């Protein structure tokens, strides 16, 4: 990772510690005044206004993302949109300004008040870098984001021949989560085409259930059991491959030199994979996680260090259905632990993941991660120590943003009028195969990938656009080598191919969900 992410990023070393006069601080007398709000102590979406003229402390999740960054691990995720057609610089720059006005946190820096990090009043617009991929060094493109000096959002626009473009959005995870970044992208394209972005909506958040429909024990008892299991389970890292394995795939090196590898499946294969998942009564996400788990085990076996225990960190959105608002983090984490014996049968592995995923969603169990984080954040030094422990907390991160097309296309239209740039819908589907940002500019694909941290050496993200499955892979090149992402991507593709060819799950799911 050092090849892309260089520079010192200590806990506070790169953040300018500013005097009290250099930022606004909300006082009790101001708390009830117009323009001020009280922040949720955990992670909820609290900004209701377009502009925030006040400062609030970072939520525990935002603080964790800030604290966990270090040299080579900047805690940034990436979203990439590929376009065909002319992209006008001034029009794009104006769209960035307009879209950012709806998302104040994209304009904020981080300072410190009484020893704790706070968001400063919006004063930094996201930067846009127009580059020629042939001549620009990757260390210039993908440098870390210093939240003490600049916005946590950066655009890198890479020009390719024949009016092709790669627009990469690099976001510090303290700013927002992946779904919020997709909506920010959607607002940008709405502004680019002189349309009105979709209105913000804040439906009521569903409450947790006391008992999961599929769980035979009370939720609290199961949580205690899973917490103890988490503490006793020590996942193994991905092992560095030998020189022979590395040389075998040297030709797969990323020619555009992004930190991550991207690939997409054909519409026919994507449909076959979804159909196989449907026949097995599981979701596409369950199949993808199972395929990644088998690929992780195959990786270590090929490296000569067979793993017995793996853990996948699964980001879980806590949004209410239909919610849309200013960019922020509204998510938690769930952890899926499996042994190598659990992964022998792909079908049984997929069913066990499906059972656990349903329990997690039904109980909103990912919120318990935030509850724990809120307690730890009262002692920042303890949180810092935990993030610096020389142990592997997760083998890999696997995220799924789902069908991104509706979020990208979200814009307001006059009653009775359709999107003038949307192509005709074929076969009765609600989402066209391609979508035009403007009359002459078309989105051809979209990828995303979450950040990694020391010990968690791989990150995988799945998106669906135009009926096709898109996947991006990010690996720790310091530990695994320069072509690690390309090699792991091949293994995941092979596992998904086997799933599409013969996923027939007749075995009953596990009685107790294993998260």
What are these regions (language model features)?
Residues 85-103, 169-186, 262-302, 471, ...:
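Acyl activation and transfer enzymes in specialized metabolism, enriched
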Residues 93-196, 261:
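Acyl-thioester-dependent condensation/acyltransferase catalytic cores
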Residues 45-113, 135-153, 298-515:
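Acyl-thioester-dependent acyl-group transfer interface
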Residues 4-5, 23, 36, 51:
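Aromatic (phenylalanine/tyrosine) cluster motif
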Residues 3, 7, 37, 41-44:
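Short hydrophobic alpha-helical segments enriched in small aliphatic residues
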Residues 45-62, 67, 175-179, 183, ...:
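Non-catalytic, low-complexity flexible loops and terminal extensions
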Residues 6-12, 20, 29, 47:
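N-terminal amphipathic/hydrophobic targeting modules at extreme N-termini
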């Amino acid at each position: 990772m050092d090849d892309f992410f260089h520079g010192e990023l200590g806990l506070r070393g790169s953040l300018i510690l500013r005097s009290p006069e250099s930022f606004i601080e909300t006082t009790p007398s101001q708390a009830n005044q117009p323009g001020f709000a009280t922040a949720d102590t955990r992670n909820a979406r609290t900004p209701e206004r377009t502009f925030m003229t006040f400062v609030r402390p970072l939520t525990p999740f935002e603080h964790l993302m800030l604290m966990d960054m270090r040299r080579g691990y900047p805690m940034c995720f990436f979203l990439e949109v590929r376009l065909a057609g002319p992209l006008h610089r001034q029009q794009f720059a104006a769209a960035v300004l307009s879209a950012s006005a709806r998302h104040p946190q994209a304009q904020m820096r981080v300072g410190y008040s009484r020893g704790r990090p706070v968001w400063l009043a919006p004063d930094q617009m996201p930067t846009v870098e127009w580059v020629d991929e042939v001549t620009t060094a990757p260390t210039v493109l993908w440098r870390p984001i210093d939240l003490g000096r600049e916005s946590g959002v950066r655009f890198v626009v890479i020009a390719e021949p024949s009016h092709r473009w790669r627009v990469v959005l690099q976001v510090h995870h303290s700013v927002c989560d992946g779904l919020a970044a997709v909506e920010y992208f959607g607002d940008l394209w709405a502004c680019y085409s002189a349309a009105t972005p979709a209105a913000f909506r804040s439906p009521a958040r569903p409450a947790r259930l006391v008992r999961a429909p599929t769980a035979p024990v009370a939720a609290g008892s199961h949580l205690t059991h899973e917490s103890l299991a988490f503490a006793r389970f020590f996942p193994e890292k991905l092992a560095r491959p030998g020189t022979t394995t590395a040389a075998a795939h040297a030709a797969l090196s990323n020619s555009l030199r992004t930190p991550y590898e991207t690939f997409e499946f054909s519409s026919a294969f994507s449909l076959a994979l979804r159909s196989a998942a449907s026949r097995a009564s599981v979701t596409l996400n369950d199949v993808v996680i199972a395929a990644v788990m088998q690929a992780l085990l195959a990786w270590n076996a090929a490296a000569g260090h067979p793993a017995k225990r793996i853990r996948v960190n699964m980001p879980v959105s806590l949004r209410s259905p239909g919610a849309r608002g200013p960019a922020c983090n509204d998510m938690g984490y769930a952890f899926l632990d499996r042994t190598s014996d659990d992964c022998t049968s792909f079908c049984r592995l997929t069913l066990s993941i499906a059972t656990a995923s349903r329990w997690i969603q039904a109980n909103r169990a990912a919120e318990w991660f935030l509850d724990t984080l809120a307690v730890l954040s009262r002692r920042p030094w303890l949180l810092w120590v935990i993030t610096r422990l020389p142990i592997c907390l997760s083998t890999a991160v696997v995220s799924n943003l789902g069908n991104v097309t509706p979020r990208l296309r979200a814009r307001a239209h006059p009653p009775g009028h359709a999107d003038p740039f949307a192509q005709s819908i074929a076969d009765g589907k609600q989402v066209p195969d391609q979508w035009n940002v403007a009359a002459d500019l078309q989105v051809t694909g979209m990828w995303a990938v979450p950040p990694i941290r020391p010990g968690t050496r791989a990150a995988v993200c799945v998106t669906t656009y135009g009926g096709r499955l898109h996947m991006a892979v990010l690996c720790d090149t310091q530990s695994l080598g320069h072509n690690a992402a390309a090699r792991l991507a091949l293994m995941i593709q092979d596992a998904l191919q086997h799933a599409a060819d013969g996923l027939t799950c007749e075995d009953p799911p596990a009685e107790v969900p294993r998260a």
